[in-house]
């Protein structure tokens, strides 16, 4: 959500200013990704990859390019079909498709998806989060169904799904910090979440 991105940027600026009084003179921009919906027509992905490099076409890449249709609903809970895609992103970013307006539009959307997926790759030494607290009754029907399909062990509450996902975003032996209710430590509905952390 764009407002959350702006608040995150503001918080980072204020923390940096607290540590370094001349920070505002440095013209430094925070590295924040606000996930956006990106959609493709059925034929567009194949046409695009055939034009830029047919060897790149795989079912995994095709699936990935269609995973951000509802990014505003699922957010960073999305698990990209491909991870560690920086090389692929660099390769496609270097492709010139400016001669074809149709391909240029698809190209920009593909780069946006890959950039967003790169942010959601497991590469972080530290993950700190204040996951949203929302039980199943508060979720829209699409999110509730999607959670059951993708986070079946922790579907009872949105914050527990985010705790699992944030753990996946960290490198092995990474540091994690959550602002979360304590209920997951003792309620039976969070037993699988407790097992998840014990087994990590």
Where are these regions (language model features)?
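SAM-dependent methyltransferase catalytic region
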Residues: 1-200
